[in-house]
């Protein structure tokens, strides 16, 4: 059993949400660490994600008992106009705009939206000591064992540390070296994502009447979804994104591919344009998600992937001085998945174990005892949840009718 070597820092690979979160938590607790990131510092992930109370509450507590308001003031997409990232969780029929499903007020989950760029910056700043983040460091190899690991980077830099924390996402370079047999599984789903901006006046005129003060306008159709979400609002501009998603229609679906796309789709597939033209969308979806308008947007084809790691494999990697957090060991599809939330919980739980346990090997074992089942079950749920969110319209209307009948019955009593 190896004792922690406090003269050697913890080496964190990846400066995404989980990497920055655990870097900040370790730094705040006096545990030396270095965060390495392959990308340049100006890389952008400007879209927003949903944070659930079971994720952000643990993070806020671990950061010293910060208030939710302290976070939303820094990360909410609508923070510049006094918003708090509120989400109404309403599902609307995207062909009529009418409400299909609305959560009960008493049972509404606590969910907020956060701009990813802002969330990363906020976490990095949540402490007295600056984080040591080294960009332009793409991992080449790792070697050694727990207590004494070496990381070599493509730029020639070499570092020794007590342990490597793999926070490098679904395509984890660390995982591909120590557990090469665990590879991402591509789910048979179609997802196109577009980013655009409008003036504040246009937003108030065209989107606000339907979305209100919420940050997501969830539109569901007959087996497909068209959410429009707020990424960032300023006094003059509103940055928005839309998604068009549905299950793949067999192997010959012209919109489904397992090939990794370029960063941005330059030439939109004719099949996508024709499919969108056939959807009789209501406003405001029709205004922004149509064959003509989307050609002026930045459009991306997203591949939905899952990563599932058995506990035995995770513990085997630990013997080589590697511990996993975030998408590197539990990637989930962006629709129906809660990967970002589990990544934050991973960071909190691993940091807590490392602070409490002087023995590195024991700290990792304690972390996996709590995290493995949580994450494995979340990956399993995420596979089916995509299809639940993309059900036929007849099922959505049946759910809506049953809820109305239940509400009417409760009012009588």
Curated annotation (Swiss-Prot):
Q: Which cofactor does it need?
A: FAD
Q: Which GO terms describe its biological process?
A: terpenoid biosynthetic process; viridicatumtoxin biosynthetic process
Which EC number(s) does UniProt give? 1.-.-.-
Binding residue positions for FAD: 37, 48, 120, 327, 340
Q: Which residues are glycosylated?
A: 5, 94, 232
Keywords tagged on the record: FAD, Flavoprotein, Glycoprotein, Monooxygenase, Oxidoreductase, Signal
- Biotechnology comment: Viridicatumtoxin and its derivative, viridicatumtoxin B, exhibit anti-methicillin-resistant Staphylococcus aureus (anti-MRSA) activity. Moreover, viridicatumtoxin and a C2 acetyl analog, spirohexaline, have been demonstrated to inhibit bacterial undecaprenyl diphosphate synthase, a potential new target for antibiotic development.
| Classification via InterPro entries | FAD-bd (IPR002938), FAD/NAD-bd_sf (IPR036188)
Molecular-function annotations in GO: FAD binding; monooxygenase activity
Secretion signal, residue range per the UniProt entry: 1-23
Q: Which Gene3D superfamilies match?
A: FAD/NAD(P)-binding domain
Do the record's keywords include rRNA processing? no
Pathway-wise, it operates in:
Secondary metabolite biosynthesis; terpenoid biosynthesis
The answer on whether this UniProt entry bears the keyword rRNA-binding reads: no
Q: Which family does it belong to?
A: Belongs to the paxM FAD-dependent monooxygenase family.
Describe the task this protein carries out.
Answer: FAD-dependent monooxygenase; part of the gene cluster that mediates the biosynthesis of viridicatumtoxin, a tetracycline-like fungal meroterpenoid with a unique, fused spirobicyclic ring system. The first step of the pathway is the production of the malonamoyl-CoA starter unit for the polyketide synthase vrtA. The aldolase vrtJ may be involved in the synthesis of the malonamate substrate for malonamoyl-CoA synthetase vrtB.
Designated name of the protein: FAD-dependent monooxygenase vrtH
Report the gene name.
Answer: vrtH
């Amino acid at each position: 059993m190896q004792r922690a070597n406090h003269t050697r820092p913890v080496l964190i690979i990846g400066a995404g949400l989980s990497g920055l979160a655990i870097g900040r938590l370790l730094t705040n607790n006096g545990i030396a660490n270095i965060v390495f990131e392959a990308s340049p510092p100006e890389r952008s992930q400007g879209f927003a994600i949903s944070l659930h109370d079971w994720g952000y509450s643990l993070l806020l507590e671990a950061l010293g008992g910060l208030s939710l308001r302290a976070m939303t003031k820094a990360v909410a997409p609508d923070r510049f106009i006094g918003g708090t990232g509120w989400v109404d969780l309403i599902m609307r029929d995207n062909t009529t705009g009418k409400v299909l499903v609305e959560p009960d007020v008493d049972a509404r989950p606590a969910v907020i939206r956060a701009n990813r760029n802002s969330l990363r910056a906020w976490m990095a700043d949540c402490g007295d000591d600056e984080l040591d983040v080294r960009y332009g460091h793409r991992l080449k190899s790792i070697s050694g064992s727990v207590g004494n690991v070496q990381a070599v980077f493509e730029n020639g830099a070499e570092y020794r540390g007590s342990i490597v924390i793999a926070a490098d996402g679904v395509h984890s370079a660390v995982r591909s070296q120590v557990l090469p047999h665990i590879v991402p599984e591509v789910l048979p789903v179609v997802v196109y994502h577009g980013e655009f901006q409008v003036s504040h006046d246009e937003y108030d005129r065209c989107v606000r009447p339907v979305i209100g003060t919420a940050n997501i306008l969830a539109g569901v159709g007959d087996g497909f979804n068209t959410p429009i979400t707020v990424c960032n609002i300023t006094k003059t501009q509103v940055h928005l994104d839309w998604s068009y998603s549905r299950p793949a229609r067999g192997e010959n679906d012209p919109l489904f591919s397992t090939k990794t796309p370029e960063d941005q789709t330059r030439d939109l597939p004719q099949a996508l344009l024709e499919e969108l033209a056939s959807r009789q969308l209501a406003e405001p979806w029709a205004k922004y998600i149509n064959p003509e308008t989307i050609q002026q947007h930045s459009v991306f084809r997203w591949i939905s992937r899952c990563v599932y790691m058995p506990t035995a494999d995770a513990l085997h990697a630990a013997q080589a001085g590697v511990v996993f957090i975030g998408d590197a060991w539990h990637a989930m599809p962006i629709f129906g998945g809660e990967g970002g939330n589990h990544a934050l919980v991973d960071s909190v739980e691993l940091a807590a174990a490392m602070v409490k346990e002087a023995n590195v090997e024991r700290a990792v074992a304690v972390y996996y005892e709590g995290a493995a089942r949580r994450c494995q079950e979340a990956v399993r749920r995420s596979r089916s949840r995509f299809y639940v969110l993309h059900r036929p319209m007849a099922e959505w209307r049946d759910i809506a009718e049953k809820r109305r009948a239940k509400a009417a019955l409760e009012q009588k009593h």
